[in-house]
Amino acid sequence: MSNGPLAPGYDSDILVEDDVRLPRMYRVLLHNDDYTTMEFVVSILVEVFRKTAEQATAIMLAVHRDGVGECGVYTFEVAETKAAIVHARARREGYPLRCSTEEV
């Protein structure tokens, strides 16, 4: 007869933890160009990356000043999806805005 939730024959005093690994994380970067408007970049940051207007403006200015700015850090699938959404919206609006991902 079992004295706990474990199957018969198992010692309920010994618990084995599984090796839990966190997923690799990726940063999403926006790259500066001479054609995409600052307003469009801010709108992308607000709509796609859920930034506040103040955060979006700060990131947009970093992109403009430094040539690149970080939008956020996500799991691989989320980062790649957000980058694809940025590219699709930029192309639809006629902008050459580039977005990339890199492992943290």
UniProtKB/Swiss-Prot annotation:
This is ATP-dependent Clp protease adapter protein ClpS. Transmembrane segments: none annotated. It comes from Nitratidesulfovibrio vulgaris (strain ATCC 29579 / DSM 644 / CCUG 34227 / NCIMB 8303 / VKM B-1760 / Hildenborough). Gene3D superfamilies: 3.30.1390.10. GO terms for biological process: protein catabolic process; proteolysis. The gene is clpS. Involved in the modulation of the specificity of the ClpAP-mediated ATP-dependent protein degradation. Belongs to the ClpS family. InterPro entries: ClpS (IPR022935), ClpS_core (IPR003769), Ribosomal_bL12_C/ClpS-like (IPR014719). Binds to the N-terminal domain of the chaperone ClpA.
